[in-house]
């Protein structure tokens, strides 16, 4: 899979930009603030319908304009598809595939798969659980786009149920019972969608765990990171179900997670914590409270890993994602956004060795010399609102 062509209109800082790419490595070089990250962010948006930098679409539209348009021609196994996304904050976004209207924007998911390495990746290791949940869900949707709908349905039910908990809790404290029958209905919805999302995550963790272990061993830059026998990297799923989670779930398994079993477990745990939820006015159980534990030996990477080990783990998560998606039959486009400036020379070289053979690698850098020789292919200079190919 590779991107042959990218065109953006009023996206971020760009009134217009038009780039033609080739398979292999491509480097976009420009000083900070010139807009090179905005270009690869546009490709990430085509792949995920979201940005790795902001949570809403509004900042993606150039100041003073009403909408942004991103077009990408993607080649996969010899077949080219043209994806067009029209981003209009406050309104429904529109999507086209080969110039024909798509039913919903998420119909384009799966046409382009990307794995993006960025300085923000350190938050996956050192940040809040939400960062790791997002990592899991984005990868889950990349592998199986239908999970975009599951996640959307779960988020919608969670908002409705949480609002009901607040009102029912206030009514109970005021002396009335509140409508608990309605709450039971929302319990059922939350358990149904939550079980689907949870099953997908559990299966994903089981699939990616061996890739994380091997990727960490490959990318670790110093002997101190890999020599001690207890410093093997691993990932484990920690569920808010606690002891209600069936035995064996949360660790790599040899069989798919059972949605019905998980739904029953969620319903049982919701009933158990009902009084606490009414008291606090929040939903205490479900995938939104879960975490992906990143382990180095028997210790969690968060809080115990050094700065170098944390970077190695972040890179390992992205490399593992790449290998997992490639196993599925469609090698993703690799995007390395200002990553080499964050890495020491050893990690730069090792990462370049590991990704140089990918079908397409797009690299952004402020200084061309930061990019290892293995990835110095086609070069574009990004300067003063223009993109120029360097021959």
Curated annotation (Swiss-Prot):
GO biological process: DNA replication; DNA synthesis involved in DNA repair; double-strand break repair; SOS response
CDD domains: ABC_RecF
Key words, A-Z: ATP-binding, Cytoplasm, DNA damage, DNA repair, DNA replication, DNA-binding, Nucleotide-binding, SOS response
Positions of ATP binding: 30-37
Location of the protein in the cell: Cytoplasm
Pfam families xrefs: SMC_N
InterPro entries: DNA-binding_RecF, DNA-binding_RecF_CS, P-loop_NTPase, RecF/RecN/SMC_N, RecF_2
An annotated Gene Ontology molecular function: ATP binding
Gene Ontology CC: cytoplasm
UniProt-listed Gene3D superfamilies: P-loop containing nucleotide triphosphate hydrolases (3.40.50.300), RecF/RecN/SMC, N-terminal domain (1.20.1050.90)
SUPFAM superfamilies: P-loop containing nucleoside triphosphate hydrolases
Protein purpose: The RecF protein is involved in DNA metabolism; it is required for DNA replication and normal SOS inducibility. RecF binds preferentially to single-stranded, linear DNA. It also seems to bind ATP.
Family classification: Belongs to the RecF family.
Classification via NCBIfam families: recf (TIGR00611)
Name assigned to this protein: DNA replication and repair protein RecF
Source species: Saccharopolyspora erythraea (strain ATCC 11635 / DSM 40517 / JCM 4748 / NBRC 13426 / NCIMB 8594 / NRRL 2338)
Gene that specifies this protein: recF
């Amino acid at each position: 899979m590779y991107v042959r062509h990218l065109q953006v209109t009023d996206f971020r800082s760009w009134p217009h930009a038009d780039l033609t790419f080739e398979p292999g490595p491509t480097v976009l070089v420009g000083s900070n603030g010139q807009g090179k990250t905005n270009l690869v962010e546009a490709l990430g948006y085509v792949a995920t319908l979201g940005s790795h930098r902001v949570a809403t679409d509004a900042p993606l539209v150039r100041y003073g304009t009403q909408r942004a348009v991103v077009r990408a021609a993607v080649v996969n196994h010899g077949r080219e598809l043209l994806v067009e996304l029209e981003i209009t904050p406050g309104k429904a976004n529109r999507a086209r595939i080969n110039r024909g209207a798509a039913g919903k924007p998420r119909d384009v998911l799966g046409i382009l798969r990307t794995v993006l390495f960025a300085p923000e990746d350190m938050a996956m290791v050192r940040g809040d659980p939400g960062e790791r949940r997002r990592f899991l869900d984005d990868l889950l949707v990349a592998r199986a786009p239908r999970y975009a709908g599951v996640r959307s349905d779960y988020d919608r039910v969670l908002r409705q149920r949480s609002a009901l908990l607040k009102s029912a809790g206030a009514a109970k404290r005021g002396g009335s019972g509140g409508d608990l029958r309605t709450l039971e209905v929302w319990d059922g919805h939350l358990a149904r969608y939550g079980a689907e999302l949870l099953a997908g995550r559990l299966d994903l963790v089981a699939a990616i765990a061996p890739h994380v272990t091997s990727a960490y061993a490959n990318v670790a830059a110093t002997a101190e990171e890999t020599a001690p026998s207890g410093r093997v990297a691993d990932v484990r799923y920690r569920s808010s179900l606690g002891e209600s989670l069936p035995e064996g779930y949360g660790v790599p398994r040899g069989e798919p997670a059972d949605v019905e079993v998980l739904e029953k477990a969620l319903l049982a745990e919701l009933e158990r914590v009902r009084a606490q939820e009414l008291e606090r006015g929040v939903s205490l159980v479900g995938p939104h409270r879960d975490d992906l534990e990143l382990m180095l030996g028997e210790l969690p990477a968060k809080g115990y890993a050094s700065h170098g080990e944390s970077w190695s783990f972040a890179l390992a998560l992205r490399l593992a994602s790449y290998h997992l998606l490639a196993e599925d039959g469609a090698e993703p486009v690799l995007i390395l956004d200002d990553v080499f400036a964050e890495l020491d020379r050893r990690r730069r070289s090792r990462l370049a060795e590991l990704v140089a053979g990918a079908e397409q690698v797009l690299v952004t850098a402020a200084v061309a010399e930061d990019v290892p020789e293995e990835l110095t292919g086609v070069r574009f200079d990004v300067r003063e609102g223009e993109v120029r190919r360097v021959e």
